[in-house]
């Protein structure tokens, strides 16, 4: 199995209300991919509880069946649609950590 962890920082020009709306959209979009993308076992998107010591706004914690499933996930049309509509327009940085478990 593979863990796919992403941290995003939202655009600073977004108001707090806009940030909450964007975070909810990211959570709904990514968590909604379970059952649609083969090999995607679990998705958790953390959008709350951020402490002042944090330097990211949103965290994706996902589990996939294999490295091959991760590659297929990254190219899956439903994932690409969520990334292009709910994530990329509103973020300024992305940090990724993929590892086998």
Model-predicted regions and their roles:
Residues 1-57, 65-75, 98-101:
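Short S/T/G/P-rich N-terminal loop/turn motif that feeds into the first structured element of a domain
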Residues 67-95:
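C-terminal structural segments of small proteins and small subunits
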């Amino acid at each position: 199995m593979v863990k796919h962890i992403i941290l995003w920082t939202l655009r600073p020009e977004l108001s707090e209300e806009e940030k909450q709306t964007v975070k909810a959209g990211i959570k709904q979009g990514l968590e909604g991919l379970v059952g649609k993308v083969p090999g995607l076992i679990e998705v958790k998107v953390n959008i709350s509880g951020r402490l002042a010591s944090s330097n990211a706004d949103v965290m994706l914690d996902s589990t996939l069946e294999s490295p091959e499933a991760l590659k297929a996930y990254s190219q899956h049309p439903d994932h690409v649609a969520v990334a292009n509509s709910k994530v990329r327009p509103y973020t300024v940085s992305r940090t990724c950590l993929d590892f086998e478990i």
